[in-house]
Amino acid sequence: MVGLKEELLKAIWHAFTALDLDRSGKVSKSQLKVLSHNLCTVLNVPHDPVALEEHFRDDDEGPVSNQGYMPYLNKFILEKVQGNFDKVEFNRMCWTLCAKKNLSKSPLLISDEDAFKVWVIFNFLSEDKYPLIIVPEEVEYLLKKLTEAMGAGWQQEQFDLYKIALNTSREGLSAWELIDLIGSGQFSKGMDRQTVSMAINEVFNELILDVLKQGYMLKKGHKRKNWTERWFVLKPNIISYYVSEDLKDKKGDIILDGNCCVEPLPDKDGKKCLFLIKCLDKSFEISASDKKKKQEWIQAIQTTVSLLRAGSPPPHKEARQKRKELRQKLLAEQEELERQMKELQTANENKQKELETVRKQLEAAAARAAEEEKKRLQTQVELQDRFSLELEREKMVRQKMEEQVAQKSSELEQYLQRVRELEEMYKQLQEALEVEKQARQDEETVRKLQARLLEEESAKRAELEKWHLQQQQTIQMTEAEKQELENQRMIKEQALQVAMQQLEQLELERKEALEQYEEVKKKLETAANNTRSWKDKVAHHEGLIRLIEPGSKNPHLITNWGPAAFTEAELEQRQKSWKGKKASSE
């Protein structure tokens, strides 16, 4: 419906423009009422005058603009169009409003009816922008169709000259200029008015009325079974047949859809060139005048059915759309080319400006270089004199610097020698510290060993005291248990002997540990003396180091908890006491 609306708007635009006498874009309300009523009548749309009054209620005085009329036209008329109207009658109504005010007063070789058909064809081929024009490509297409319909040869060179003259003045032709062009006979020289009129009518039937093919053929009746000559007209979805080609007496229609088909039939009953059109409800037997016409009709009907199945528009409408798309594509390419040319031109101008700027910069640079060269030559002599004085001064300074460097080198060598001596002393001091550290580690190891031995000794002593108490308890037992206790005492005595031996062994180990501790202590004192000696030497050289000597230690027994709470004499006294108690118990 969008395409139908655009086609209707073109004809309505002509009618509205004709009513706009002063070209101001405004038409009086009374004229719009008449136009709206006529449009509703020819388009089979119910007319609502109240809606028009309501739409323009704020503009009762004076004319109203076409911007205000367009919303009304779209809402109350065009949106209600269903397509069940006479296209020719609609166009003729719009033509009646605009023809008298726009047709040329000069005599034309075509009739008013032919001019009307050319005007309708113009609306079909014109561009979808206002004011309406037909571009030269579509003019060429139309003239070729007319020339072909007249059976004449196409004059391409003549049209090229006309096209060149046309392109220099405007983009295309208006409807009235196209009518003047065809009516002037410029491209139909040697043809009479009747031939031109027939050609216009043929092109009108094809492009506007969607007539794909027409002609006389015989049709077999369904009731009486007789053959009657009819004038057949093939359109995209229907085949209509009439009594004659004036289309006044219509006898019937053959409705086409995607389920229809056409088949050739063999000759029979004296009829030749037969073919059959099959539809859902009935079939039609047709007889053409010759085999060529038969094949043309079969091919045309098959093509029409194929288009119906595919949902495609008629060939001439599809071709028009393709031509428009091609023109749009070429126009886009041309605009892109023009844009690129403008960019190149702009870039070229920018380059020229840059070159001019560079040239000026080079000239200025050359002038500056000449001036600088002059200044350089002038200052060169001054610099040479100044450099000579500075050279003498530098020689004297260099001599003084060499003397200072020699003195500093000697001082540096002495300083490095002292540094090497200090490094050697530090190295020896580090070795002495390592020896002292190792001696302290040995002392700690011996101390831990002595503590472990004392702990084991204490455990054995506690065990011996426990056994002694048990022996005293066994003495107080009865005589009946004495023998058994004696045996147990002998066993315990043996165990006590073993424990005493272990205690003696531990005593020996403790003494050995004390001896090792004394040796380690001597080594530690020796290492401390060596460390103190080296530290004194380092302090003597540096004047900084002062060693603090540790105080002397008295030898004493060491346990896991520190110095022992008893002496060796007390330990021997306790051993004698334990032996005496053991002997008395026996």
From Swiss-Prot:
Residues 210-306 form the PH domain. SMART domains: PH. InterPro entries: EF-hand-dom_pair (IPR011992), PH-like_dom_sf (IPR011993), PH_domain (IPR001849). It holds the Pfam family PH. Residues 316-538 form a coiled coil. GO terms for cellular component: cytoplasm; lamellipodium; nucleus; plasma membrane. The keyword Cell membrane applies. Disulfide bonds: none annotated. Keywords: Cell membrane, Cell projection, Coiled coil, Cytoplasm, DNA-binding, Membrane, Nucleus, Phosphoprotein. One of its GO terms (molecular function) is DNA binding. Tyrosine-phosphorylated. It comes from the Eukaryota. It is found in: Cytoplasm; Cell membrane; Nucleus; Cell projection, Lamellipodium. The PH domain is essential for phosphatidylinositol 3,4,5-trisphosphate binding. The SWAP complex consists of NPM1, NCL, PARP1 and SWAP70. Phosphatidylinositol 3,4,5-trisphosphate-dependent guanine nucleotide exchange factor (GEF) which, independently of RAS, transduces signals from tyrosine kinase receptors to RAC. It also mediates signaling of membrane ruffling. Regulates the actin cytoskeleton as an effector or adapter protein in response to agonist stimulated phosphatidylinositol (3,4)-bisphosphate production and cell protrusion. This is Switch-associated protein 70. It comes from Gallus gallus.
